[in-house]
Amino acid sequence: MLRRALEEAIAQALKEMGVPARLKVARAPKDKPGDYGVPLFALAKELRKPPQAIAQELKDRLPLPEFVEEAIPVGGYLNFRLRTEALLREALRPKAPFPRRPGVVLVEHTSVNPNKELHVGHLRNIALGDAIARILAYAGREVLVLNYIDDTGRQAAETLFALRHYGLTWDGKEKYDHFAGRAYVRLHQDPEYERLQPAIEEVLHALERGELREEVNRILLAQMATMHALNARYDLLVWESDIVRAGLLQKALALLEQSPHVFRPREGKYAGALVMDASPVIPGLEDPFFVLLRSNGTATYYAKDIAFQFWKMGILEGLRFRPYENPYYPGLRTSAPEGEAYTPKAEETINVIDVRQSHPQALVRAALALAGYPALAEKAHHLAYETVLLEGRQMSGRKGLAVSVDEVLEEATRRARAIVEEKNPDHPDKEEAARMVALGAIRFSMVKTEPKKQIDFRYQEALSFEGDTGPYVQYAHARAHSILRKAGEWGAPDLSQATPYERALALDLLDFEEAVLEAAEEKTPHVLAQYLLDLAASWNAYYNARENGQPATPVLTAPEGLRELRLSLVQSLQRTLATGLDLLGIPAPEVM
């Protein structure tokens, strides 16, 4: 990467100036000279010089890498203009994943209660989690994707109770998770709901004993059909009943009790409970005490989350895994009493959970620190995200007001089919094209926005072939692929024939790896999504460029040498868009 090589050269020159600093090189503004630039304002205080003087001194001291044509002081910046041929060679270099580095990153996402169909709110969780896992893997990390199955939770118990209580029989036509979800909603609308609590508790206790697992699994398999349709990937399923059976909770509490900040008060409102004082790690709390174990001996969900986190990071062991029989994911493994012992010992974890769970996630990190693992606490990340509206409406599964992911997929595909029919009535496979466009529209809309901002999914906007949408990027890819298909084979490009149009497009292509690394470091895919939108816009501007009323950048009819250069750039662009879309879990259609 040219940027990284330039950063190394700058760091060496600054070291010789007595400043051991590593500055980030970024794209120079389009109205300023140069391609890249580095700001020097942060060094003014240490060097006791104005930034303009530092820029000039750095220029004088810096041996320019061979790919840099000149260094240009611009105010408090030092900008760099790259040699055109070096820029083009780098842009045409085939893209490849970054070298593998040691250490496992464990990404937990989806983790939907196994009691009903997935709804729109789950879409964002799956799209974010799956995309960040793909991005991290491309960036050189060993990634494990985990889906947590809360089979001992109240929601699962209520659904299984409702199916029996109302004597419901599945007819095989409706998806089973939808069938189960209707029973769950019926129970919550039942005027006898409160009277039924003791019977629901009996089902809950049966689940805690590891019973009724096959009934839960039946719902889970139906949910997994939806996850597979969304193109999500998983490596491990972890069932809460297996965590209970392995005694991870007791082991975690025993470990925490060794800390002076975890204790059992003898009096007051917490008398008899096991309490954690989080104030040494989270200052400023109005009430810093959090119950891990109630006075009646039952665990809070804080305690369960902490125990699970301890297992993820290798502090505790005890879970076993075996292959999971399912028609969607051949290599998937599930926790099970009869499996083989396995602990991921993750160096870093990312829990994709909505922003309303920020406080419990902070307590998980606090528990790691108080248990004597402050370094691991720093590596336990919460990818928090805001809620999703559908056409301006808020969802509520318990009230039966949620729209299922299956319905969204079906409706988006129906609308996409009509668009494909209108734009390309001779398309060889309209159904597959519609599926790909619908998936691109849905998944892109879930990741293009910064996670902590609420989004409102609207079909017409998301499916548009124009604007900041997945289909817009997919269409840019298909247009590039069409040119390559018509071109057939071509020879070596003549880099010396490049015009400013090729130079500008090549410079944008160089930003791909930087976008991937930034998305991986910031742990949010919206950075990559925005890059793909910008690259698609650059490609469309290149494709449609005109001078004196004539096309300025014809590809197939360009002179020899320039034609090969333009085809090579189009190929690099097509591959970059395809790779970027894949990292977001989105297919790249060849024809639209």
UniProtKB/Swiss-Prot annotation:
Name of the top EC class for this enzyme: ligase
InterPro entries: aa-tRNA-synth_I_CS, Arg-tRNA-ligase, Arg-tRNA-synth_N, Arg-tRNA-synth_N_sf, ArgRS_core, DALR_anticod-bd, Rossmann-like_a/b/a_fold, tRNAsynth_Ia_anticodon-bd
A GO biological process held by the record: arginyl-tRNA aminoacylation
Record-stated family: Belongs to the class-I aminoacyl-tRNA synthetase family.
CC terms in the record's Gene Ontology section: cytoplasm
Protein's organism: Thermus thermophilus (strain ATCC BAA-163 / DSM 7039 / HB27)
Pfam families for this protein: Arg_tRNA_synt_N (PF03485), DALR_1 (PF05746), tRNA-synt_1d (PF00750)
Subunit (UniProt): Monomer.
EC number: 6.1.1.19
UniProt motif 'HIGH' region: location: 112-122
Catalysed reaction equations from the record: tRNA(Arg) + L-arginine + ATP = L-arginyl-tRNA(Arg) + AMP + diphosphate
Keyword Nucleotide-binding: yes
A single MF term (Gene Ontology): arginine-tRNA ligase activity
SMART domains: Arg_tRNA_synt_N, DALR_1
Gene3D superfamilies from the UniProt entry: Arginyl tRNA synthetase N-terminal domain, HUPs, Isoleucyl-tRNA Synthetase, Domain 1
Major localization class: cytoplasm
Spans through the membrane: none
Compartments where found: Cytoplasm
Superkingdom of origin: Bacteria
Name of the molecule in the record: Arginine--tRNA ligase
Keywords of the record: Aminoacyl-tRNA synthetase, ATP-binding, Cytoplasm, Ligase, Nucleotide-binding, Protein biosynthesis
